[in-house]
Amino acid sequence: MAITDWPEDERPREKLLARGAQALSDAELLAIFLRTGQQGLTAVDLARRQLVSSGGLRAMLDLSPERMAHLPGMGVARRALLLAALELGRRYLAEPLERGLPLDNPDKAGQLLTAQLRGLPFEVFACLFLDNKHRLIAFEKLFQGTIDAAAVYPREVVRRAMEHNAAAVILAHNHPSGVAEPSQSDHAITRRLVEALGLVEVRVLDHLVIGDGGWVSLASRGAV
């Protein structure tokens, strides 16, 4: 049975407009993107297959464009639409914090940094540069690859902080494994940067480790 033959209040698009996006399942939301199904499959059926094939919604949305292309029914046009929507979501999450609002608690910083770093297939070390009222001056991704004490250069972080005339910074990096628990190396990096930035009177407010399910604040654990 085609979706057009379903009761109107069960069709994904009409259901979304009448009851809000929160009322739809993952497959129903994805079906709105797909618009049509395949031979013998409605858009909702096809969406379910894609979700099962990729291991769930989060795993699907974290796929690289190349791997996403192998999902059933995911052609170039659909892939482009989905990737564009994901980027719009990331920018929406980041934009409110780019207007000079104070980043005075881990939740505000965590929202911005999660939007930028979660789900990347490699480690990225980034920094929020703040003014003396803890308002955002700039966000920069400084290093990528295997992030350990040998791969993060305090001199470069200090240089960028001084170029931005920053009074404080919030450090962050992601764990591609999805597990946000800080490692011994994470603690070592934090200590080195606190010491180096302290020499130029730049405060390290926090170091956030970003995972799939959220983030861990080293400051909240007394490590900053």
Swiss-Prot record:
Any one GO biological process: proteolysis
JAMM motif, short sequence motif: residues: 173-186
Domain MPN, chain residue ranges per copy: 102-224
Superkingdom assignment: Bacteria
GO molecular function: metal ion binding; metallopeptidase activity
Signal sequence bounds: none
Assigned keywords, A-Z: Hydrolase, Metal-binding, Metalloprotease, Protease, Zinc
Binding-site residues, Zn(2+): 173, 175, 186
Entry's family note: Belongs to the UPF0758 family.
Name assigned to this protein: UPF0758 protein ABO_0214
